[in-house]
Structure formats: C-alpha cells, structure tokens
C-alpha cells in the first residue's frame, strides 16, 4: 500500500483536498473511509460527491446523507453510478452479496464507510484507504493510502 497523503486539516482544508481528489477519480475506483463516529467520513464523502457533480457541470444532489440505515444510497452521474455504502450495521459478507455489493464495484465509483470487513479482501480494483482521526473539534488528521 502506497501512502499518498498525511495531513492535519480543518473543514476548509478538507474542501480543498476533496476538490483535488475529484480531479483524479476514475471509474472503478473504490474509496474506503475509516474513522471513529463523528470523525467526518460522511462529510468528506458529501464533499467528494458534490465536487464530482460540479466537475461534470451537473447540479449537486439536493441531499447527501449517511446511508447508515439504508446501507446504500446511489447517485447517478452521467452514465455511471456513485455508490455510497455505510457498512456499520452489516454483519457478514453474505449481507453484502445480497445487496449485489461486489457486482456494483465494476464500472462505477464507490465510497464505503466502515469498511473493516473488506480490508483483508482482494478487491481486484484500485482502492484508496482514507483514515480520519479527530485531533480537535475542528481538525482532523487524514491519511490516504493507495493500493492496486
């Protein structure tokens, strides 16, 4: 796994980082977000999704929320899907299979909160592991690693 970034950021810095990341997001990329409750996983994903729409000259989605209860929220971006998963309540890989999780990784962009059950799996795709640690009420330490 190759470390790409290790920064301490406030919200404005997170906005800038999300804008820069979006310029390099490719179809098939998988982003795994780790961090304690309240670390900013959903906030970071919300910024990424909004920026993807802006970069494609499309109106931002009216609402981007955490899929803790539905487990998956899908956003349509031109001819592809953005999948936003929250695996906090998922207890087994069988549950993921029932959601067509592994099939959905192909030809889409996928953001996953609470990916711990996936870390040791061979995802067969480029993926990024993003760890958010709370430093203070307004600052987060963000580590981004890339794996092919």
Region locations from a protein language model:
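Phosphate-binding P-loop
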Residues: 21-28
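Hydrophobic anchor at the beta1->P-loop junction of P-loop NTPases
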Residues: 31-33
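Conserved lysine of the Walker
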Residues: 41
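Post-Walker A helix-loop "phosphate-sensing" segment adjacent to the P-loop in P-loop NTPases
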Residues: 50-63
